[in-house]
């Protein structure tokens, strides 16, 4: 999770359609020039409200398998293309190999005070076939595949560094949790790919990034892409249930204000279960007693490892689950707004949400600590 992303998008998105600089590469090499021109055309198609036609740039097999065949596109944020960050893109490295051209790009933005903000350093691999004149990108996941192992367990295909010793116990724990969720909620099994590494740096490298905004974070995190049935995560090993639940719930409930909080409740977040998040929120409220939870939908957190909105919604899910079980949780997912939810489920007005929520966070935190 990258909670500050939207702030930077709002500040800088108006500047993102900028120039691509190629002064550092050897444009006298015709193959390099061809690859650079191809790449520049690709970048130009990432506009404010549109994406490229991937079939023009990526192999047919990749486009048939993936809605987004480029693993770099949604690496900084899951809903905003990496290539739209920063107005200045500098291709500073171009090297020809026997079957492809390797390009490195620095993506930056300079603010009004001449401060340079670095968003990403990317690696792209352009395949050139001089006999057929075909040109296309090779996925970093394919280029880097020799560095990773693949292991299938149940419906999960794991991809992870060769240096990592696979933890069967954690994998079995995840499979057990998935099967219970499928049974309880009536979902059919899903086959999916699970890419994981021990750190953000390693995950970035797997996807073709030497650097990306937020890479310095050390806590567990991940992203899920239900359309492609893929999850990427770091620092949490073989059993990150949170992202897996997105594969099941997002296709049906992504627009529900309850969805992400429900996933917090069922799958925890940042490597911790929901009881830990309750305790963390209760501690946060004691540290910042002026926090008004009646405004939880729009509150900015002072702790980037605590998402107030999702944790509050998770608490609501816990209360309803204890009262009405899964049918109650399914009922919550039908609500379009929280005003109606609080009126129908708890018979309270917005001015009273703060007291109600704080009392329940304290109640459950006290129970957890007994």
Show which residues each predicted segment covers:
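Juxtacatalytic substrate-recognition/specificity segment
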Residues: 148-255
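Soluble non-cytosolic domains of exported or imported proteins
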Residues: 29-37, 48, 164-175, 231-239, ...
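Acidic/His/Gly-enriched intrinsically disordered linker/tail segments
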Residues: 252-370
């Amino acid at each position: 999770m990258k909670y500050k992303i939207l702030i930077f998008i709002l500040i800088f998105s108006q500047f993102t359609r900028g120039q691509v600089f190629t002064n550092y590469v050897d444009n006298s090499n015709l193959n390099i020039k061809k690859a650079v021109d191809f790449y520049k055309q690709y970048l130009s198609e990432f506009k404010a409200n549109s994406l490229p036609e991937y079939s023009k740039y990526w192999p047919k097999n990749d486009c048939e398998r993936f809605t987004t065949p480029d693993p770099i596109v949604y690496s900084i944020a899951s809903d905003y293309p990496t290539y739209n960050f920063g107005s200045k893109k500098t291709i500073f490295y171009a090297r020809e190999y026997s079957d492809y051209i390797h390009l490195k790009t620095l993506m930056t933005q300079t603010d009004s005070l001449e401060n340079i903000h670095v968003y990403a350093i990317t690696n792209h691999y352009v395949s050139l076939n001089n006999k057929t004149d075909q040109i296309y990108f090779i996925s970093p996941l394919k280029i880097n595949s020799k560095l990773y192992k693949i292991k299938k367990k149940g419906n999960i295909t794991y991809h992870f560094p060769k240096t990592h010793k696979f933890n069967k116990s954690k994998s079995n724990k995840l499979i057990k949790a998935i099967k219970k969720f499928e049974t309880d909620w009536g979902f059919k099994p899903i086959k999916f790919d699970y890419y994981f590494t021990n750190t953000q740096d390693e995950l970035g490298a797997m996807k073709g990034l030497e650097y990306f905004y937020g890479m310095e974070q050390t806590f567990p995190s991940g992203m899920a892409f239900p359309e492609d049935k893929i999850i990427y995560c770091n620092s949490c090993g073989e059993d990150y249930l949170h992202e897996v639940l997105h594969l099941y719930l997002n296709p049906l409930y992504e627009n529900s204000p309850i969805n992400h909080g429900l996933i917090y409740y069922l799958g925890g977040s940042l490597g911790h279960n929901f009881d830990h998040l309750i305790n963390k929120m209760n501690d946060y409220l004691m540290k910042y007693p002026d926090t008004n939870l009646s405004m939880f939908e729009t509150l900015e957190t002072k702790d980037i490892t605590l998402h107030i909105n999702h944790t509050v919604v998770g608490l609501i899910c816990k209360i309803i689950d204890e009262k009405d079980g899964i049918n109650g949780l399914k009922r919550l997912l039908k609500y379009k707004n929280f005003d109606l939810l609080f009126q129908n489920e708890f018979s309270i007005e917005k001015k009273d949400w703060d007291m109600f929520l704080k009392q329940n966070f304290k109640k459950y935190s006290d129970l957890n600590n007994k």
